[in-house]
Amino acid sequence: MAALPITWKAGSDVQTYEKARIGRVFNHRRPDRYPIAVIEAKEESHIVEAVRLAREKNCRLSVRSGGHSWAAWSVRDGAILLDLGQYKQIDLDEKTGIVQVSPSTTGRMLNGFLTTKGRLFAGGHCPDVGLGGFLLQGGMGWNCKNWGWACEQIVAVDVVTADGQQLHCTEHVNSELLWAARGAGPGFPAVVTRFHLQTRPAYKHMRSSGYCYANADFQKAMKWILSITDGFDPDTEVVLVASYPPGSEGIVHTVLFVAFKNDPEEARRALQPAQDSHPAGTVHEWFNRETSLQDQYKDQGAANPEGHRYRVDNAYISNDADVASVLEEAFTTLPTKKTFSLWYSMSPGTRRPLKDMALSMQTDHYFATYSIYEDAKDDDLASSWVKKVMAGIERHSEGAYLGDSDFQVRRTRFWGEKQGVKLMELRRKWDPKGTICGYLDEGDKSQQNGLANVHEWSAKL
């Protein structure tokens, strides 16, 4: 076993410690929180040793897979930070299509490997997001509206529990932890060392269509896509994005369709209803353009640039809401040129019964906004704008998605009522001493209690 690769805050030079503390934090709004040490694990034994060291030191352990984690959940005062960035594994069983992956494996890494084997995993849209946090939060992956949540494809997880046990968890053995791994988010009461994921056959032909409308035509674009999305092709994902395209002085609303098919003519037929029905007046459009997963990763990476500051929030809009009216301000008043807002179609997947799992919050309409900028002087502008638009939107929402949330700023419902209660009970059962850092709320006070899973805004009415 290799020596434990640990950097202690006490005794290390500032540059070395800071690189370990925040070098892999995506959001450049850097947290003012300081772990007592950072362990950069290279093998599974390092993870086991990290858990045992935290118990020996009577401190908490936080875990970093390497995603966007807008609030930098892994950086906690007084904790040992376990960074899994250098712990890598991808192994495919070609007979079953089940792949074993380490938490820091990104979607682009995994699909780059799987493509050579004729397989696909519908992971995160952004190429640089580690699967660990993505899957624990539920995983709103490619074509989620039709193929379901990525966490539903978790066959098993290997974990190190808060008391140092190494367990294999399936629906039949240690099933409580698999239940929690499908949607607990950063409150999962153990450290995942390995995910066992069911892959699907890769698609040979991907095509996209896009219809771009001026800011004044937001209502027209939104109402159109709402009218056709429910019955649309089952291998096509649908999204509406408000942004300032490169070189544009005005906000543009792009309705984007991405079809996954094995035949080019089938892809064209899938996209044809949008081509035939889209409203006139586009400022730019394309139909049935050849694309690929790598092309889509490139576009997603450009929209979510590294080296920037982010303020992000989201909501599941109620199915009976006037969606176009509820979202109008968030789509038509973007505060910076790099900010974007999106509506993501979740229907018809929301109409089918979910697995029995922690993930239990969804509606037909997912909304998220990403206020992006480079200068710290714009922190207040970004924060105040997001707070303002969310104040209007949250009253028409059922809850929020963990992956685009910051519990320090806004807390709402993240699970169904029964699932939320069960999850908090499991956290206390499997980690009674609160060794594994849980949900980072305001002041990091939640500890073993977790989140209340209620609309906090309703108490202010």
Predicted regions and their residues:
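Soluble FAD-dependent oxygen oxidases
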Residues: 1-461
